[in-house]
Amino acid sequence: TCVLIALSGCTNGGSNKESMEVVLNIKRKVKPECVSALKESFLKCKESTLLEPGCIDYGMYQSLTDSTEFFIAETWKNDGELQKHGETAHLKQHLNEIKDMGDPSYKGSFRKIYVCPSVND
Protein backbone atom coordinates (compact mmCIF):
# COMPACT_ATOMS: atom_id res chain seq x y z
CA THR A 1 0.00 0.00 0.00
CA CYS A 2 1.29 3.45 -0.89
CA VAL A 3 -0.50 6.54 0.42
CA LEU A 4 0.32 10.21 -0.17
CA ILE A 5 -1.27 12.75 2.17
CA ALA A 6 -0.83 16.51 1.87
CA LEU A 7 -2.06 18.77 4.64
CA SER A 8 -3.16 22.26 3.71
CA GLY A 9 -3.86 25.43 5.60
CA CYS A 10 -0.45 25.90 7.19
CA THR A 11 -0.36 28.98 9.37
CA ASN A 12 3.24 29.76 8.48
CA GLY A 13 2.73 31.12 4.99
CA GLY A 14 0.81 28.61 2.95
CA SER A 15 0.74 24.99 1.97
CA ASN A 16 3.41 24.92 -0.75
CA LYS A 17 4.73 21.34 -0.80
CA GLU A 18 8.29 22.57 -1.38
CA SER A 19 8.23 24.31 2.02
CA MET A 20 6.61 21.45 3.90
CA GLU A 21 8.29 18.79 5.99
CA VAL A 22 8.00 15.22 4.73
CA VAL A 23 7.14 12.32 7.02
CA LEU A 24 7.57 8.74 5.83
CA ASN A 25 5.92 5.82 7.61
CA ILE A 26 7.02 2.43 6.35
CA LYS A 27 5.83 -0.95 7.62
CA ARG A 28 7.71 -4.08 6.63
CA LYS A 29 8.26 -7.64 7.74
CA VAL A 30 11.42 -9.72 7.40
CA LYS A 31 12.17 -13.40 7.44
CA PRO A 32 12.76 -14.59 11.05
CA GLU A 33 16.40 -15.42 10.35
CA CYS A 34 17.00 -11.84 9.13
CA VAL A 35 15.84 -9.86 12.20
CA SER A 36 19.32 -9.28 13.65
CA ALA A 37 20.87 -8.47 10.28
CA LEU A 38 18.11 -5.94 9.50
CA LYS A 39 18.64 -4.18 12.83
CA GLU A 40 22.40 -4.07 12.34
CA SER A 41 22.14 -2.71 8.80
CA PHE A 42 19.55 -0.10 9.81
CA LEU A 43 21.64 1.14 12.74
CA LYS A 44 24.65 1.66 10.46
CA CYS A 45 22.50 3.58 7.99
CA LYS A 46 20.83 5.59 10.79
CA GLU A 47 24.18 6.79 12.14
CA SER A 48 25.06 8.46 8.83
CA THR A 49 21.49 9.52 8.03
CA LEU A 50 21.12 11.54 11.24
CA LEU A 51 24.18 13.57 10.15
CA GLU A 52 22.43 14.66 6.94
CA PRO A 53 21.42 18.34 7.23
CA GLY A 54 17.89 17.66 6.00
CA CYS A 55 17.12 14.82 8.42
CA ILE A 56 14.91 15.75 11.37
CA ASP A 57 14.23 12.24 12.66
CA TYR A 58 14.99 8.69 11.55
CA GLY A 59 13.99 5.62 13.53
CA MET A 60 12.94 2.00 13.34
CA TYR A 61 10.65 0.29 15.82
CA GLN A 62 10.01 -3.42 16.29
CA SER A 63 6.51 -4.78 16.92
CA LEU A 64 5.84 -6.07 20.42
CA THR A 65 3.63 -8.86 19.09
CA ASP A 66 5.64 -9.94 16.02
CA SER A 67 9.43 -9.72 16.20
CA THR A 68 9.69 -9.83 12.41
CA GLU A 69 7.52 -6.73 11.86
CA PHE A 70 9.15 -3.28 11.80
CA PHE A 71 7.92 0.30 11.55
CA ILE A 72 10.24 2.93 10.08
CA ALA A 73 9.54 6.62 10.70
CA GLU A 74 11.48 9.36 8.92
CA THR A 75 11.04 13.13 8.99
CA TRP A 76 12.78 15.41 6.47
CA LYS A 77 12.96 19.21 6.16
CA ASN A 78 11.48 18.98 2.66
CA ASP A 79 11.15 16.74 -0.38
CA GLY A 80 14.47 17.93 -1.81
CA GLU A 81 16.34 16.74 1.28
CA LEU A 82 14.57 13.38 1.10
CA GLN A 83 15.63 13.09 -2.56
CA LYS A 84 19.26 13.80 -1.57
CA HIS A 85 19.02 11.05 1.06
CA GLY A 86 17.95 8.63 -1.67
CA GLU A 87 21.28 9.20 -3.42
CA THR A 88 23.56 8.66 -0.40
CA ALA A 89 26.04 5.80 -0.30
CA HIS A 90 24.90 4.69 3.17
CA LEU A 91 21.26 4.32 2.09
CA LYS A 92 22.23 2.49 -1.10
CA GLN A 93 24.42 0.13 0.96
CA HIS A 94 21.59 -0.48 3.45
CA LEU A 95 19.06 -1.20 0.69
CA ASN A 96 21.50 -3.59 -0.94
CA GLU A 97 22.11 -5.39 2.37
CA ILE A 98 18.40 -5.89 3.08
CA LYS A 99 17.10 -6.55 -0.44
CA ASP A 100 16.51 -10.29 0.16
CA MET A 101 15.39 -10.05 3.81
CA GLY A 102 11.72 -9.23 3.25
CA ASP A 103 8.96 -11.71 4.01
CA PRO A 104 7.53 -12.42 0.53
CA SER A 105 4.06 -13.14 1.94
CA TYR A 106 3.79 -9.69 3.58
CA LYS A 107 2.55 -6.69 1.62
CA GLY A 108 3.77 -3.91 3.95
CA SER A 109 2.95 -0.25 3.53
CA PHE A 110 4.51 3.09 2.65
CA ARG A 111 3.00 6.47 3.52
CA LYS A 112 4.43 9.85 2.54
CA ILE A 113 2.86 12.77 4.38
CA TYR A 114 3.52 16.49 3.88
CA VAL A 115 3.17 18.53 7.09
CA CYS A 116 3.60 22.15 8.09
CA PRO A 117 7.09 22.75 9.48
CA SER A 118 7.60 23.62 13.14
CA VAL A 119 4.07 22.64 14.10
CA ASN A 120 5.44 21.09 17.31
CA ASP A 121 7.78 23.92 18.30
Which residue ranges define each predicted feature?
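C-terminal motif of bacterial Sec signal peptides marking the signal peptidase cleavage site
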Residues: 6-9
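Short, conserved catalytic or interaction motifs in soluble domains
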Residues: 12
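Glycine-rich beta-strand-turn "strand-cap" elements at beta-sheet edges
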Residues: 15-19, 59-68, 95-121
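Short, well-ordered beta-strand segments in beta-rich or mixed alpha/beta enzyme
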Residues: 22-29, 59-86
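Short, surface-exposed ligand-recognition loops at beta-strand->loop->(often short) alpha-helix junctions
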Residues: 29-38
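An amphipathic, aromatic/His-enriched active-site/gating alpha helix that lines ligand/cofactor pockets
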Residues: 44, 48-57, 75-110
